[in-house]
Amino acid sequence: QAMFKDGNIDIVYNATPHNSHYEIMKDALLHNKHVFCEKAITINSYELEECVEIVKERHLVISDGVTLFHMPLFKRVKKVISLNYLGPVKMVQVNFGNFKEYDVNNRFFNPNLAGGALLDIGVYAVSFARYFMKTKPDIVLTTMIPFETGVDESSGILLQNKEMEIVIIFLTM
């Protein structure tokens, strides 16, 4: 709270576990601080929408820490597509997994700490794939395979827009 009240601080960097992002971000915004937040910026769209409203009212800035847009491979793919080497992109498929040793007490497997594949690595996959769609999807289908704790061990996502562009994503941890 002292940090939020400090007039010498203009921006807050939030690198706490996912489940606390919303409260910290909202508190910072209500104290007129800009916020740079690690992914996932919030655990659902309702939390983000509320923060965006505060941002608009107070003329602040929020940003998330999805770094893939700055990586050399992403820049190369973007260039290849922009030069039309591949023709029109109609489908993007992303398979993204990482291995986390199963530990019921680890935040990655804890539903109270916003664990699971979607909130941990899904942000990267969805951001990457959505970047190449001309418009937002009209159809969103998802499925998941849970760990015993209830968080998603694996998730499948299908997105489709009016231009008939399709995104297929598979995540696992």
Which residues are covered by each model-predicted region?
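Short, Asp-centered acidic motifs that coordinate Mg2+ and/or phosphate
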Residues: 10-11, 91, 166
